[in-house]
From Swiss-Prot:
Protein name: Mitochondrial inner membrane m-AAA protease component paraplegin
Species, as recorded: Mus musculus
Lineage, opening ranks: Eukaryota, Metazoa, Chordata, Craniata, Vertebrata
Annotated GO MF terms: ATP binding; ATP hydrolysis activity; ATP-dependent peptidase activity; metalloendopeptidase activity; zinc ion binding
InterPro entries named among the record's database cross-references: AAA+_ATPase (IPR003593), AAA_lid_3 (IPR041569), ATP-dep_Zn_Metalloprotease (IPR050928), ATPase_AAA_core (IPR003959), FtsH (IPR005936), P-loop_NTPase (IPR027417), Pept_M41_FtsH_extracell (IPR011546), Peptidase_M41 (IPR000642)
Expression tissues: Expressed in the brain and retina (at protein level).
Gene coding for it: Spg7
Active site: E575
Length: 781
């Protein structure tokens, strides 16, 4: 230990530097080290300054230069000859300046950091630059220690640069060819060092390494064995290889081991110190980085983000979240009236409706720090990291107040806490949730930190998270209405090169896509542009949008799937049954298109209807929807006297509608006006039902009666119009795709009056009329 401390003192420049000891370590000549290279030569030109010292260098460098001026041996000489280190004085910067080995400044900075001060953007930048300087300083120290360790390793392994050889290679490739200059025996290790002549050729190639090692079994009889080999090779006495013996000193090996140990410990100390500095939690811990909240800071002042004008639709939601932005921009307008801004808001709604997009707009418009983090990033495998990251996130938010914290997909950490004693609860998630509750509204909660969160599973969130004082404002973002869909289409059509103005497409596309989310609408616009580019068009046309809508609904046509003639007939009658029942009944949607082309979503055909924006349904409307879904199954049974598995999805829809009418809508007279929630699976797949087994049997019976009644009614409609069913099926087998105009020409208009629809043929005719009038250029062929 004393030797290690002595070595470290020699590495640390101070008022009285010790360059002799440093260079002795670098050159490999320490006390007690023996070498066969000869004795140290006396110093020459000791007082003659050269290099940087002659130009007025620093005093430590001048002192080191005066001592290191003579010719060098070992690794130092090799470095100088190869111009890796052009001058010995260059070794001084490698070991670091006096600042790098002085910790007094660091301690003073740490004391300054402990002083309380308010954070401004300038302070944040200054603190960031200071931490970068400190990190750079410790990296320089690590770099210096690595260089010292590398040099010491080179000094120790320089003699082994040629590798090991066998006795046969030594005799046949070296000794017999006269390439050996001398041999040195190391008795303690049973190793023989073979030194070659400069420019020696071994194994047919010139070798740069002039020393090789050879392991010998009986080192005492090596010289005898060597002379016997020379006799066999008829080598004359004057050309015999000289043999010398080398004994390693114990003190030199011990000093080298202590030096490497000291350097290794110093490297480890600096690594842990650097890790402790990097963590914002402070302290000497390498796990501080794991505890840091990995949030994203959104700077709204750059002007590159999403504004409220870029968010189409969602008028009510934008109005509610705009209050947070107005409060952060001008809080005095609210405070003078005694109003308090809500502590947080929860954005709810189906996937793809724009919750995250609205949060991005808030980040841009608020002009305050916006810290965004995803819910799954809180929870890791290591226990306790979730709570630590919550503390880190809110600590940073309070330092930057006024500030907005946004947690996306909060259901990952905000699920309801388990109340059972079964032991299956997730303790890590509950700890994270508890810490989040405390940070949002606890003893140390401060104002001017607003929390935004989004999820599409509000039913699983804990009640304590959604109470007033935490996420007290719930903003529901539902699927867009007709007007909102038109605005969203207008927004996404701005970036496309269209044949007609965007207003020509937006209203029609909005009517074609009821129930579509904003993400679906963006996908339709993108698919239309991709299809136009794939077809080689110079602009996006109407049929490109038709293709995009059809692709999103049913998938793209799969031309590689070829059906047999019999299967094509079954699919044609199946789809004709859907279309005919929907055409003849009163409360069904308009049939826009019927196709028997296979699709990539495993559908062998589809009937495209035009659903209406309808929120209330009568019993008759739901019943006729069941009949329309059963039209394909009934058409198969009537036409072929058998049924296939193609109606699986239709039967699933019919069953769901029937049970909804009985269990939730109260439309079954025998059950009465009661409503039960949908069945949810509990622990181990066992569901809890709020009704008896007898009532369940009654509801099953009522649902079965409804489905049977709908099927009988569907069969009657098809049997009364069997010729029309045959005509539709034949047209499908001939054309593969028929639309509203084709159906009307085949079987006449709907008996209950024209249905609300957007006919693709009329849309195309309208576009052609515009083009004929010269308002826009003609579409590309």
């Amino acid at each position: 230990m004393a030797a290690a401390l002595l070595l470290l003192r020699g590495l640390r420049p101070g008022p009285e530097p010790r360059p002799r000891r440093l260079w002795g370590l670098l050159s490999g000549r320490g006390p007690g080290l023996s070498s066969g290279a000869g004795a140290r030569r006396p110093y020459a030109a000791r007082g003659t300054p050269v290099g940087p010292a002659a130009a007025g260098g620093h005093a430590p460098q001048s002192l080191l230069l005066r001592i290191l001026t003579p010719s060098f041996e070992g690794i130092s000489g090799l470095l100088l000859k190869q111009h890796i280190v052009p001058n010995a004085v260059r070794l001084w910067p490698l070991s670091g300046s006096t600042l790098y080995f002085n910790t007094s400044r660091m301690k003073q900075k740490n004391k300054d950091n402990d002083k309380p001060k308010g954070k401004t953007p300038e302070d944040d930048e200054e603190e960031k630059r200071r931490k970068e300087r400190e990190d750079q300083m410790y990296r320089e120290r690590l770099r210096t220690l690595f260089i010292i360790a590398l040099v010491m390793s080179l000094l120790n392994s320089l003699s082994t640069s040629g590798g090991s050889i066998s006795w046969a290679d030594f005799v046949n490739e070296m000794l017999a060819k006269g390439e050996v200059q001398r041999v040195q025996v190391v008795p303690e290790s049973d190793v023989v060092e073979v030194y070659l002549h400069p420019g020696a050729v071994v194994f047919g190639r010139p070798r740069l390494a002039l020393m090789y090692r050879m392991q010998v079994a009986n080192i005492d009889k090596f010289e005898e064995k060597l002379r016997a080999a020379e006799d066999e090779l008829n080598i004359e006495s004057k050309d015999r290889i000289p043999v010398s013996y080398k004994r390693t000193g114990f003190f030199g090996n011990a000093l080298y081991a202590l030096g490497m140990t000291a350097v290794g410990l110093a490297i480890l100390w600096y690594v842990f110190r650097l890790a402790g500095m990097t963590g914002r939690e402070g302290g000497f811990s390498a796990f501080n980085q794991l505890k840091m909240a990995r949030f994203t800071i959104v700077d709204g002042k750059t002007g590159k983000g999403v504004s409220f004008q870029d968010v189409a639709g969602m008028h009510e939601a934008k109005l509610e979240v705009r209050e947070f932005v107005d409060y952060l921009k001008s809080p005095e307008r609210f405070l003078q009236l005694g109003a308090k801004v809500p502590k947080g808001a929860l954005l709810l709604g189906p996937p793809g409706c724009g919750k995250t997009l609205l949060a991005k707009a808030v980040a841009t418009e608020a002009q305050v720090p916006f810290l965004a983090m995803a819910g799954p990033e809180f929870v890791e495998v290591i226990g306790g990291l979730g709570a630590a990251r919550v503390r880190s996130l809110f600590k940073e938010a309070r330092a930057r107040a006024p500030c907005i914290v946004y947690i996306d997909e909060i259901d990952a950490v905000g699920k309801k806490r388990s109340t059972s004693m079964s032991g299956f609860s997730n303790t890590e998630e509950e700890q994270t949730l508890n810490q989040l509750l405390v940070e949002m509204d606890g003893m140390g909660t401060t104002d001017h930190v607003i929390v935004l969160a989004s999820t599409n599973r509000a039913d699983v969130l804990d009640n304590a998270l959604m109470r007033p004082g935490r996420l007290d404002r719930h903003v529901f973002i539902d699927l867009p209405t007709l007007q909102e869909r038109r605005e969203i289409f207008e927004q996404h059509l701005k970036g496309l090169k269209l044949t007609q103005p965007s207003s020509f497409y937006s209203q029609r596309l909005a009517e074609l896509t009821p129930g579509f989310s904003g993400a679906d609408i963006a996908n339709i616009c993108n698919e239309a542009a991709l299809h136009a580019a794939r077809e080689g068009h110079t602009s996006v046309h109407t049929f490109n949008f038709e293709y995009a809508v059809e692709r999103v609904i049913a998938g793209t046509a799969k031309k590689s799937k070829i059906l047999s003639k019999e299967e094509q007939r079954v699919v044609a009658f199946h789809e004709s049954g859907h279309a005919l029942v929907g055409w003849l009944l009163e409360h069904t949607e308009a049939v826009m298109k019927v196709s028997i082309a296979p699709r990539t979503n495993a559908a062998l055909g589809f009937s495209q209807m035009l659903p209406r924006d309808q929120y209330l349904f009568t019993k008759e409307q739901l019943f006729e929807r069941m009949c329309m879904a059963l039209g394909g199954r009934a058409a198969e049974a009537i036409s072929f006297s058998r049924v296939t598995s193609g109606a699986q999805d239709d039967l699933r829809k019919v069953t769901r509608i029937a049970y909804s009418m009985v269990k939730q809508f109260g439309m079954a007279p025998s059950i009465g006006p009661v409503s039960f929630p949908e069945a949810q699976e509990g622990l181990m797949g066992i569901g809890r039902r709020p009704f008896s087994q007898g009532l369940q049997q009654m509801m099953d019976h009522e649902a079965k009666l409804l489905v049977a009644k709908a099927y009988r009614h569907t069969e009657k409609v098809l049997l009364d119009n069997l010729d029309k069913l045959q005509a539709l099926a034949n047209a499908l087998l001939e054309k593969e795709v028929i639309n509203y105009e084709d159906i009307e020409a085949l079987i006449g208009p709907p008996p209950h009056g024209p249905k609300k629809m957007i006919a693709p043929q009329k849309w195309i005719d309208a576009e052609k009329e515009r083009q004929a009038s010269g308002e826009e250029e003609a579409p590309a062929p």
